């Protein structure tokens, strides 16, 4: 189940929301898009990237037309991935991008931390969730110690996004994936 928790920078809980419509409304206030998608055809558990793209093509095309995305792909992360620890550490540092960061969770989950102002928004994304983080928004991502997800990603440039780290240690002050998901 998707869940948004909003904290002060010092860690005081302000709001805790589980209703997808309310999550979308709250995130819209900081220009973050949150939607729930459904495939236009049933997907097998071992669906190919092409089958996944085709199942969500109507939604992908809608976002391409609205935001001018130039490319998209499917990324998978499993507990067996040889670089999972290295990638987790990279994503756990607060950063920005000059491009949108768009993820649709086909299956599995992950936690986005958004820090656009004097608050921290912790969003646990689950299968069926789309999040679009606007350019230059401070954020970080935690996929957990044993990641298991498949996502569609969309980009406005063919080379995708490049992280620009802020140097802040704020990510160390908030709960990691395991505590967010199990807490």
UniProtKB/Swiss-Prot annotation:
It holds the Pfam family ARD. It is an enzyme of class 1 (oxidoreductase). Fe(2+) binds at residues 95, 97, 101, 139. Pathway: Amino-acid biosynthesis; L-methionine biosynthesis via salvage pathway; L-methionine from S-methyl-5-thio-alpha-D-ribose 1-phosphate: step 5/6. The record marks 103 as: Important to generate the dianion. The record marks 94 as: May play a role in metal incorporation in vivo. One of its GO terms (biological process) is L-methionine salvage from S-adenosylmethionine. Its EC number is 1.13.11.54, 1.13.11.53. One of its GO terms (molecular function) is iron ion binding. The keyword Lyase does not apply. It comes from the Bacteria. Binds 1 Fe(2+) cation per monomer. Binds 1 nickel ion per monomer. Ni(2+) binds at residues 95, 97, 101, 139. Keywords: Amino-acid biosynthesis, Dioxygenase, Iron, Metal-binding, Methionine biosynthesis, Nickel, Oxidoreductase. Its cofactor is Fe(2+); Ni(2+). The keyword Oxidoreductase applies. It catalyses: 1,2-dihydroxy-5-(methylsulfanyl)pent-1-en-3-one + O2 = 3-(methylsulfanyl)propanoate + CO + formate + 2 H(+); 1,2-dihydroxy-5-(methylsulfanyl)pent-1-en-3-one + O2 = 4-methylsulfanyl-2-oxobutanoate + formate + 2 H(+). Belongs to the acireductone dioxygenase (ARD) family. Catalyzes 2 different reactions between oxygen and the acireductone 1,2-dihydroxy-3-keto-5-methylthiopentene (DHK-MTPene) depending upon the metal bound in the active site. Fe-containing acireductone dioxygenase (Fe-ARD) produces formate and 2-keto-4-methylthiobutyrate (KMTB), the alpha-ketoacid precursor of methionine in the methionine recycle pathway. Ni-containing acireductone dioxygenase (Ni-ARD) produces methylthiopropionate, carbon monoxide and formate, and does not lie on the methionine recycle pathway. HAMAP family: Salvage_MtnD (MF_01682). Monomer. This is Acireductone dioxygenase. The lineage of its organism: Bacteria, Pseudomonadati, Aquificota, Aquificia, Aquificales. The gene is mtnD.
